[in-house]
């Protein structure tokens, strides 16, 4: 089967048609909020390309890239990489709360923590410490960005979320400046 696929790819390439396989690893947020639209346009333009997608946390995707299990990785953060690397976007993290809680001191209502990778957790913890909020214990720990947004939307607390997920959020958002 692999030889048959390679032969077909060679024939198509000899006819100047773009084909083959691309093994793409994408961070969860990019895969959820941006990749479907991009992937649709790509596969419409290059229907002979077999696109294989793996999603996960950036650290895991970087390991897959190092083991040649994926060809390209769209990841958050900086990793020691000797080959081609390109910054494709940059986005802030945001403090989010419901409109009813806007302007209220953050110490007066619950902080909603979100499970994320260790690098981002460390950045969030540094921001909390720099703003005298390190002593705050999350009242909830949530795995899902969408669940965090809903908790915040209903006024159950405030959270720190990436801008990428906030297009449909109708509450208060404030860009945060964090060490990178």
PLM feature segments, named:
Residues 1-16:
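Alpha-helical "hinge/linker" immediately C-terminal to small N-terminal DNA-binding modules
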Residues 110-134:
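Secondary-structure junction motif
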Residues 56-109, 164-167:
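Acidic, Gly/Pro-rich loop/turn segments at junctions of secondary structure
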Residues 82-87, 91, 150-180:
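Beta-alpha-beta core module
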């Amino acid at each position: 089967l692999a030889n048959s696929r390679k032969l077909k790819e060679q024939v198509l390439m000899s006819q100047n048609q773009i084909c083959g396989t691309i093994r793409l690893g994408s961070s969860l947020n990019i895969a959820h909020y941006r990749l479907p639209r991009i992937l649709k346009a790509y596969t419409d333009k290059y229907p002979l390309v077999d696109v294989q997608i793996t999603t996960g946390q950036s650290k895991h995707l970087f390991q897959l890239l190092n083991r040649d299990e994926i060809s390209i990785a769209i990841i958050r953060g900086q990793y020691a990489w000797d080959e081609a690397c390109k910054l494709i976007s940059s986005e802030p993290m945001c403090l989010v709360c419901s409109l009813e809680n806007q302007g209220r001191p953050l110490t007066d209502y619950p902080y909603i923590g979100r499970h994320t990778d260790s690098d981002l957790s460390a950045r969030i913890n540094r921001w909390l410490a720099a703003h005298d909020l390190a002593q705050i214990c999350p009242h909830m720990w949530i795995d899902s960005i969408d669940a965090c947004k809903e908790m915040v939307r209903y006024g159950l607390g405030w959270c720190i979320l990436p801008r990428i997920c906030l297009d449909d959020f109708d509450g208060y958002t404030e860009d945060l400046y964090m060490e990178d």
